[in-house]
Structure formats: structure tokens, C-alpha cells
Amino acid sequence: MSDFIDLITPSQDAVVARLKAGVSPALGSVHQHVKQDTQPPFVMVGSIDAANEGSKGSQAENITVELHFVTRGPSRAPLMALMHAARACLEGAALEADGVVFETPNYLGATVSNAGADGVTYAGISTFEFIAEPA
């Protein structure tokens, strides 16, 4: 039996790298962690869940990643454009990280909010899943 490795961190890093390479900065910035007072528009990695998909003695994990989006403006159009750009660069794309093999991400769905209390802030969540295993 081989040693088990951390698959969550390289999964997060691979998603962030793919988003940074594929989402135009004009649509929004990409973050693993959003610092306080970061102004929209942006996308950040939210919750990450890992479920065992390996057989006895082997490691494979079904990784589910939420992406959180925040925009500000007179309509939801910029939010939906940012969410679409993220989907376009992740769904079916090759993820890469040293020591890890990924299946291509599958898009599971999304939620888009109404305007926040200020009337101009919009938020959304998109969810993707993929299998990760040691190389």
C-alpha cells in the first residue's frame, strides 16, 4: 500500500491556476483567499469537499469545489458573465499539479442572487467536481 497524500491542496491550487489563466481580469480577479476590503468583481474558491473513491489500499477522491463570485453594478449581467467565464475555462479542462492526476471537472450547477441590501451587489456560487488521485 502506498502512502496517502494531500489531494485537497493541489486540487485547490490547480483550480485557481486554471481560473487565473482563463478568466479575463476585466471580468474579475481570482483568489484562493479574499483579503478584507477586496473590491468586487472577484471569484474565490469556497468550500472544498473530498469523498473517498478509492478501493482498499488505493487513494482516489471525488473533489467538489464551490466557486464564490461577487460583483457590483446596476444588474446581474457582470456576475453571470464572470460565472460563465469560470465555467468555460474549467468544465472539461485539464487540471495540473505535481504528483496528482485529475479527471476533467464537471459542472454541477450554479446559483445567482438578487441584489444585496445595497441594491448593487450580486453574488453567485458555481459547483464543480472531479476525481483526483496520486500520480
Predicted segments, located by residue:
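Small/polar-rich, solvent-exposed N-terminal microdomains that initiate assembly or binding
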Residues: 1-55, 88, 93-101
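Residues at secondary-structure transition points
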Residues: 6, 10, 54-58, 73, ...
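Acidic-leaning, charged glycine-interspersed low-complexity segments
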Residues: 18, 25-26, 88-135
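Short, polar/acidic, helix-capping and beta-turn segments at strand->helix junctions
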Residues: 37-42, 53-62, 118-121, 135
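Oligomerization/assembly interface segments of phage tail-like spikes and tubes
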Residues: 59-73, 122-132
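Mid-chain, well-packed structural core segment of small domains
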Residues: 72-92
